[in-house]
Regions:
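Cyclic nucleotide-binding regulatory module and flanking cytosolic helices
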Residues: 1-38, 77, 82-83, 87-91
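Short, Lys/Arg-enriched N-terminal segment that forms or immediately precedes the first helix
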Residues: 8-9, 137-148
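Amphipathic, well-packed alpha-helical segments that form the structural scaffold of globular domains
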Residues: 26, 134, 138, 157-165
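Cyclic-nucleotide recognition modules
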Residues: 29, 73-131
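Glycine- and acidic-residue-biased ligand/ion/polar-headgroup-sensing regions
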Residues: 39, 50-63, 79-80
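Short phosphate-coordinating micro-motif centered on Lys-Gly-acidic
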Residues: 41-47
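N-terminal positioning helix adjacent to the helix-turn-helix/winged-helix DNA-binding module
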Residues: 148, 152-159
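Phosphate-/nucleic-acid-contacting segments
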Residues: 159-180
Length: 180
């Protein structure tokens, strides 16, 4: 219980909650814990996103494909990380990336009804949830309005930044030069 308590404190959704609030959430919420080995798929592109999945420990590789699968981008993410929270509800509640464990990884999943119950009961949690989803939406919209750079090198950097979750860290781009 103490380990879960410490892990939840690291997750942005739970930051700002008191110790009593966290203990109440732990006591009332059904958490589904999952353990993954090397190269195990945690979440697959196209899979229904009906739980909030949180990477508690380990590292994952995420792969995003173009709609026509003509190119892909790999990124590497460290725990703690909330896996595509913005796809949990809305028009298309499906994962748009595949998340694969690099080594041993642990996740915890929270169902929709439990998440809504926590959100109803704890205003700080609700504010955190709205802030995270709003920040993701605002970043996505701002990317659309950035001007295209003129030189080739800057265009490649622009392309990578507009298709990645994070601007920093290791990336692998698989694309034919004719497409680029």
């Amino acid at each position: 219980m103490l380990n879960l308590y410490d892990k939840l404190r690291e997750i942005p959704l739970f930051q700002g909650l008191t110790s009593d609030n966290l203990m109440q959430i732990i006591g009332q919420t059904k958490f589904s814990f999952k353990k993954f080995g090397k190269n195990d798929i945690i979440k697959k592109e196209g899979e229904k996103c009906d739980n909030v999945a949180i990477l508690l420990s380990g590292d994952v590789k995420t792969i995003a494909y173009a709609d026509d699968h003509g190119y892909s981008i790999e990124e590497y993410i460290k725990a703690p990380y909330i896996i595509q929270l913005e796809h949990f509800m809305g028009l298309s509640p499906h994962y748009t990336r595949t998340f694969t464990s690099i080594g041993e990884s642990n996740t915890v999943e929270i169902g929709q009804s439990d998440l809504m119950h926590i959100s109803d009961e704890f205003i700080i949690f609700r504010i955190n949830l709205l802030n995270i989803v709003s920040a993701i939406a605002q970043k996505a919209e701002s990317k659309l309005w950035r001007p295209m750079p003129a030189d080739t090198r800057s265009r490649i950097v622009f392309f990578l930044k507009s298709h990645c979750l994070y601007p920093t860290g290791a990336k692998v781009l698989r694309i034919k030069m004719t497409r680029l």
